[in-house]
């Protein structure tokens, strides 16, 4: 929440053209507490040792696991991107399961190098489905998570690999390359379900 006299009254809606979506956002994103107007940013922050507020995540990207721990999906994704095999990643978790999983768009050059070192041939899709490749990349991703200081429940336990890049054209990301989680989950539903089997 941020509040004070500089917080606006809400999103502008013209009286002659009411917008129900904006009206709903004005109700859900703005509130008055003890006479002070607040805006619900949706950000999750933490104070640093020197008292500065640091934005660390978005509330909508926090997921509660079965045991009650919260996983910050974008934090996990940022750590996974440090793995040389990972081009893009989407972490997934829900309250029905005790661990997170991830869908990874592989980097082609490191993938081919890994395949050659293991004497595995095939096109990119075949490599992404190869059990040895999946295990090697999963292990590398888990090592990146340890190096990124993720705790055990934050580290995805299983991984689904894809060679197809996520672009605005295939509607997996926005024009600003932010993940469209619902679209990715829908496209990889069978792989995510298999990861929880």
Could you describe each region identified by the protein language model?
Residues 1-65:
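Conserved ATP-binding/catalytic segment of the ANL
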Residues 7-12, 29-30, 52-81, 111-131, ...:
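Adenylate-forming
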Residues 40-44, 83-110, 145-148:
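C-terminal boundary motif of the adenylate-forming
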Residues 63, 88-90, 138, 143-197:
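Conserved C-terminal "lid"/linker of ANL adenylate-forming enzymes
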Residues 76, 133, 137-141:
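Generic structural signal for hydrophobic residues
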